[in-house]
Amino acid sequence: MHVKPLSKPHTLTALESLVHRTSDTHCAAQLYELNKRYQLEHAFMALLNQIDHTHFECIWQYQTHHNIYINLIIITDNAVHLFKFNDYSGLHHIDGDGMLINSTTYTTHADISELHCMKYSVINVMPETSTQLPVYTKCVMFNETFMLDIHSHPGDILLKDQILPYLERMSICSKKKKKQHH
């Protein structure tokens, strides 16, 4: 079930119509990033469609008032899963503040930090009857060249080849929980 289905963002449609009428590099860069984000969402949707996800509630393209963008929220009977997609490449590490950093360029990515902020926001708005539901966060790495250094804990990282097995486990665990309730 889709609470909020995957759709083409309005901003992306608007920028596509403007890109041929302007030489603004900011507009072109924003269009590129939105297109990339939308393509990653479709890639994940293709993997999600390979499993039985009829018992999942999916909220696609969630953005908070703090401009934190979560690509997908999946709610099952036994957990809430927050996903943020990217295509970072190369060796990265997680610093002491929980920031993901490219070990070559030292570019800092706030994905994990944003997921954790969102996690605590979700926990705070859950009704008291649902507070026992765990909230899991996954920063999904679609680029096959992404590597995490051996000193960084990979708990919030989901590599491309791990996506489908992770979704299958989610589906199995959710079905088991449903059977226990019946």
What are the functions of these language-model segments?
Residues 1-68, 75-79, 102-182:
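Surface-exposed interaction regions that form or flank ligand-binding interfaces
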Residues 74-99:
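Active-site beta-strand-loop-beta-strand hairpin of nuclease catalytic cores
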